[in-house]
Every structure is written in structure tokens, then in C-alpha cells.
Amino acid sequence: MELKSFQIEASEQIAERYESYMNDPLYIRKNEIVPFYQNLSAITGAGKTLVLADAIEQIRAMTTTQPVVLWLSKGKVVVGQTFENLSNGKYADNIPSYAIKPLLD
């Protein structure tokens, strides 16, 4: 699915924040970094799922390891829709070769 210009700008900003953070991360211990955290809020229908899917692809291109993404939402309906859209729905092509799993798996 194609992103709109404001969505591209948002996904690039998230990926750039990740890259910047990984260049100078916070540490829990000497060899244990605090994971990168990004919160995204926007009105319903703004394309948050698409923005984050695109950001994940950009982040994957920056790393030598497969990123692990914990995707949280307050609403059960939103969680179900997001799971479907990312695993085999309209956004699945935006994050190819990812294993999409519910948290309990």
C-alpha cells in the first residue's frame, strides 16, 4: 500500500530516531542497552499501522539483526485489526518476511 507524504515523513522520522538512538543508546548495564521505544498517536484513519510498518522496514534495512517489535494498543478491536492487516491483510506486503504473532505466542 502506498504511503501519503505525511506518512512517509512520519515513518522516516521514526527510523531516524532509531538510528540516532542506536548510535548512542542508554545502558541498563555495561553490555545491556535499554530497548528503543517509540510511541505514535494519531486520529483514527490516519494510517498509524502503515506508518509503523514502513518504519519497521526502514529499521530492518539499518540493522544486521531482525528487529523485534512489540506493538501495543488499548483497544481489542484495534489489536485484532492490526494483527490481521499485518499478517495477511492490506499491510502484509509492507512488511514482507516477518513473523507476526500475538503476544501470548
What does each model-found stretch correspond to?
Residues 1-105:
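RecA-like P-loop NTPase motor core of helicase/translocase proteins
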